[in-house]
């Protein structure tokens, strides 16, 4: 008797954007794909509606799902996948893929009408894409004690929050002074985040295969303070002038805030475990940029080449 090889992803979890009525229909279409390939399906009880299907898989807690799955399918926008990526950081080697029910979709790149691409991924036909994560730490200046920590796949932002005044920052990279400047804040971004807040702040687009970090000042008072790209193994430390310490917050992917206090500083470096995304065959980052940023459209009022 022929034995079927084990599926590339034996246990698959599905997490959806809460409150989206279209998710139930997508789940109904995904379940037969998983069943046909011998995959165990787990639904996130926090976000997934009841399907009413006799083949209804287990609805489990978010923690159970994150610990058990080899692949997690995120149904929603980029924010949904970012939330999941932050949650799995450092847990285990779990892959993430996204079905786009949001707007832009830089990370969730499978359209609901193209679920055949999900089938290809489940069959092992996929592009693996490892993305750098940032580890943000609030540390004591006195003895370097870790006070608070979080992770980010897009960016860590030190920003003013309860004042209209600029804040004063001192930045060091690997212990070497970089700048003392006044601004509305500082964006510390991954290559993934280079097409998010950092791009809006005038930073460059950095290919996600590069092991790098971006420093992008937010409205700096001195125009010579420009965006900077540094090696991904760098340790970035930021001190806030004591006069402004109560007026700043540290935001991780705009999903969680850390508070600085007198005598503490922000330390940002690469997380030891990257996020593993999987894309359908033929995935191209440059095609994604063309589609999402409108680079592929015709030039206005210019005859096409060869016309």
Curated annotation (Swiss-Prot):
Disulfide bridge partners, by residue number: none
A Gene Ontology biological process term: NAD metabolic process
Localization per record: Cytoplasm
Residues annotated as binding NAD(+): 78-79, 83, 154-155, 165, 182, 184, 255
Highest taxon of the lineage: Bacteria
Requisite cofactors: a divalent metal cation
Keywords: ATP-binding, Cytoplasm, Kinase, NAD, NADP, Nucleotide-binding, Transferase
Catalytic-site annotation from UniProt: 78 (proton acceptor)
Principal subcellular localisation of the protein: cytoplasm
Catalytic activity: NAD(+) + ATP = ADP + NADP(+) + H(+)
Alphabetized InterPro entries for the sequence: ATP-NAD_kinase_N, ATP-NAD_kinase_PpnK-typ_C, NAD/diacylglycerol_kinase_sf, NADK
GO cellular component, one term: cytoplasm
Alphabetized GO MF terms: ATP binding; metal ion binding; NAD binding; NAD+ kinase activity
Xref: SUPFAM superfamilies: NAD kinase/diacylglycerol kinase-like
EC nos: 2.7.1.23
Keyword Signal: no
Family to which this protein belongs: Belongs to the NAD kinase family.
Function, in words: Involved in the regulation of the intracellular balance of NAD and NADP, and is a key enzyme in the biosynthesis of NADP. Catalyzes specifically the phosphorylation on 2'-hydroxyl of the adenosine moiety of NAD to yield NADP.
Name of the protein in its database record: NAD kinase
Taxon lineage: Bacteria, Pseudomonadati, Pseudomonadota, Gammaproteobacteria, Chromatiales
């Amino acid at each position: 008797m022929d034995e079927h090889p084990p599926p590339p992803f034996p246990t698959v979890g599905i997490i959806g954007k809460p409150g989206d009525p279209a998710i139930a229909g997508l789940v109904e279409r995904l379940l037969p794909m998983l069943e046909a390939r011998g995959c165990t399906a787990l639904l996130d009880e926090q976000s997934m509606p009841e399907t009413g299907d006799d083949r209804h898989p287990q609805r489990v807690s978010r923690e159970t799902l994150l610990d058990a799955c080899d692949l997690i399918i995120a149904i929603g926008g980029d924010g949904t996948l970012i939330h999941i990526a932050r949650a799995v950081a450092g847990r285990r080697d779990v892959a993430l893929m996204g079905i786009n029910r949001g707007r832009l979709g830089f990370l969730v790149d499978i359209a609901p009408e193209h679920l055949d691409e999900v089938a290809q991924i489940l069959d092992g036909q996929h592009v693996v894409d490892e993305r750098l994560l940032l580890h943000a730490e609030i540390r004591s200046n006195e003895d370097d004690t870790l006070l608070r920590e979080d992770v980010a796949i897009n960016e860590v932002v030190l920003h003013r929050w309860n004042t209209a005044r600029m804040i004063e920052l001192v930045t060091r990279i690997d212990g070497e002074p970089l700048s003392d400047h006044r601004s509305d804040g500082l964006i510390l971004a991954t290559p993934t985040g280079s097409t998010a807040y950092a791009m809006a702040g005038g930073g460059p687009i950095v290919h996600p295969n590069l092991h790098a970090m971006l420093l992008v000042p937010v409205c700096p008072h001195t125009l010579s303070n420009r965006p900077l790209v540094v090696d991904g193994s760098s340790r970035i430390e930021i001190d806030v002038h004591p006069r402004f310490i109560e007026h700043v917050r540290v935001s991780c992917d705009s999903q969680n805030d850390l508070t600085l206090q007198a005598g503490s500083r922000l330390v940002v470096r690469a997380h030891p475990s990257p996020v593993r995304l999987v894309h359908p065959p033929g995935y191209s980052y440059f095609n994604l940029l063309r589609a999402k940023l409108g680079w592929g459209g015709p030039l206005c009022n210019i005859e096409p080449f060869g016309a």
